[in-house]
From Swiss-Prot:
Protein name: Putative transporter svop-1
Membrane topology, Extracellular segments: 107-120, 179, 230-237, 341-372, 432-434, 488-489
Family designation: Belongs to the major facilitator superfamily.
Annotated TM spans: 86-106, 121-141, 158-178, 180-200, 209-229, 238-258, 320-340, 373-393, 411-431, 435-455, 462-487, 490-509
Gene name for this UniProt entry: svop-1
NCBIfam families: 2A0119
Membrane topology, as annotated: Multi-pass membrane protein
Length: 520
């Protein structure tokens, strides 16, 4: 058989027209190698397709269709795939909450064991949040460049290992060092929201992100219960060991996490994105849109994880306001958590000595069973905060919901100025904590929505870093300044909430009903 006949058979087997017989063997081989599954030939080096007799009559109608990740995610809806993702990413939030709640529980025990001052107690919290602040942007860049799943896995492994080691600390300053490293690992946990949000359809995204925060509430309540049963019998070291275990469990479970399809498209791997979306469609028992998966932007045309892009003209105002909102919210939320312990340890008949010279606290004053019970009661406020946010966020919008929750927090915080009994103080703290918790959830919904895929993780990372600045400062207000006057922290936290209200209403973009962007 001659060369021309062989080439003709190859052309027919490849569904190419006879017009290609005039090509040289080298050209022909190059064209055949570019034949895709839809039999559409790619012309990378030829200017005029018609000269080669493009086989338009050979294409199926579906081969001309395309769809984006946004369209695929909308088609997926909310099903078994998202439920599995909710549980896996929720485990990270539960572990994070336990580590954060731990900070308010161990300080009195450390004061009894090592005789540390209130400033040193505040340093324990400050070191953890310093580590989180330093690492939040780092983990955001890792997730934007190497993938959400890898960043989450490594960050939780670091947090788990350092958390266990810190429980073996022989000295206070050794404890500070390892708690700082624990915080460095925990700084990557918020990226679980980035991964989760990128698989949620627009209509359900806000409610689902808020609902995943219920795992935070579960973790906080579980930590309070754990302390109730463990601290008196086994001490703070045992509590620290047990509190680190969920981080290790999540690190192992993260191997079952899917990589973000949006990340794969943005990083130039559409085949991986399609595999993930097809697996999700099979699990949800739905069909993806017909056609070929394409990106709404050219792969690699925009740098990923570049912090400077957060301050580009179209994002600058949003970014600066979000940094303020996150710092204020963390300052107020963690401040109320720490301040609750201070209030419950006060001996003043007004339960807080609001107009006296101090709280008259002893160096060693461990929490009692009654204190743990009241801490548990105020921690349960996380749940109504979540429910309220879920009910109003889609109706009221993200910005107005945040503003409303800041306003309620400020009102109930200022009410603590009055001379009140312990039960009334507990109720006021319960309501205040419910609404500041809700404001935090709104920030976690809004931030991934407002940033494009190429900046989403680093945007959330920098916001998380700003939150840690607020959290670093707040122990010195809640635990140190309160020794002089409890009226000072109350005034500061109430005023901070008013500033948060103004900042949230000043945000230039409302993301309610808005699809996630791939680029800016």
């Amino acid at each position: 058989m001659g060369d021309k006949a062989i080439l003709t058979e190859v052309l027919e087997a490849s569904n190419l027209t006879e017009a290609y017989v005039d090509l040289t063997a080298k050209q022909l081989i190059k064209e055949i190698r570019h034949v895709g599954d839809d039999f559409a030939v790619r012309y990378s080096n030829l200017d005029d397709r018609t000269e080669l007799g493009e086989p338009t009559d050979q294409r199926s109608p579906d081969s001309e269709k395309t769809f984006t990740v946004d369209e695929a995610v909308e088609a997926l809806g909310f099903g078994r795939f998202q439920l599995k993702l909710s549980i896996l990413t929720g485990m990270a939030w539960m572990a994070d909450a336990m580590e954060m709640m731990l900070l308010s529980l161990i300080s009195p025990a450390l004061a009894c064991e090592w005789g540390i001052s209130s400033v040193q107690q505040a340093l324990v919290t400050t070191c953890v949040f310093s580590g989180m602040m330093l690492s939040s942007t780092f983990w955001g860049k890792i997730c934007d460049r190497f993938g959400r799943r890898k960043g989450l896995t490594f960050s939780t492994l670091v947090a788990c290992i350092m958390g266990v080691i810190s429980g073996m600390s022989p000295h206070f300053y050794v404890l500070l060092f390892f708690r700082g490293l624990t915080g460095f690992g925990i700084g990557g946990v918020p990226q679980s929201v980035t991964l989760y949000a990128e698989f949620l359809p627009t209509a359900q995204r806000a409610k689902c992100v808020v609902l995943i925060e219920s795992f935070w509430a579960i973790g906080a309540v579980f930590e309070a219960l754990l302390a109730y049963f463990v601290m008196e019998s086994f001490g703070w070291r045992a509590l620290m060991f047990l509190s680190s275990l969920p981080l290790g469990i999540f690190a192992v479970a993260s191997f079952w996490l899917p990589e973000s399809a949006r990340f794969d498209m943005a990083s130039g791997h559409p085949e991986r994105a399609l595999e993930t979306l097809q697996a999700a469609a099979r699990m949800n028992r739905v069909q993806l849109p017909t056609g070929r998966l394409v990106s709404s932007t050219k792969a690699g045309s925009e740098s990923r994880g570049d912090i400077a892009n957060l301050l580009s003209p179209d994002l600058r105002k949003t970014t600066i306001l979000l940094w303020c909102i996150w710092a204020i919210t963390a300052f107020s939320y963690y401040g109320m958590v720490l301040f609750t312990t201070v209030l419950f340890q006060s001996h003043d008949e007004c339960h807080g000595g609001l107009f006296s010279n101090g709280t008259q606290m002893e160096v060693c004053q461990p929490l009692t069973r009654s204190d743990y019970f009241d801490l548990l009661s105020t921690t349960l406020a996380e749940f109504p905060g979540l429910i309220i946010t879920v009910l109003i966020i889609e109706w009221f919008g993200r910005k107005k919901t945040m503003a409303l929750e800041y306003a309620v927090f400020a009102i109930f915080t200022f009410l603590l100025y009055f001379c009140l009994d312990r039960f009334t103080v507990t109720v006021l703290i319960f309501v205040a904590r419910a609404f500041i918790s809700g404001a935090f959830q709104c920030a976690y919904v809004y931030t991934p929505e407002v940033y494009p895929t190429t900046l989403r993780a680093v945007g959330l990372g920098t916001c998380s870093a700003m939150a840690r600045i607020g959290a670093i400062v707040t122990p010195f207000i809640a635990q140190v300044a309160s020794e002089k006057s409890l009226s000072l922290p109350i005034g500061i936290y109430g005023t901070a909430a008013i500033l948060g209200l103004i900042a949230s209403l000043s945000l230039p973009i409302e993301t309610k009903g808005r699809q996630m962007m791939d680029s800016h």
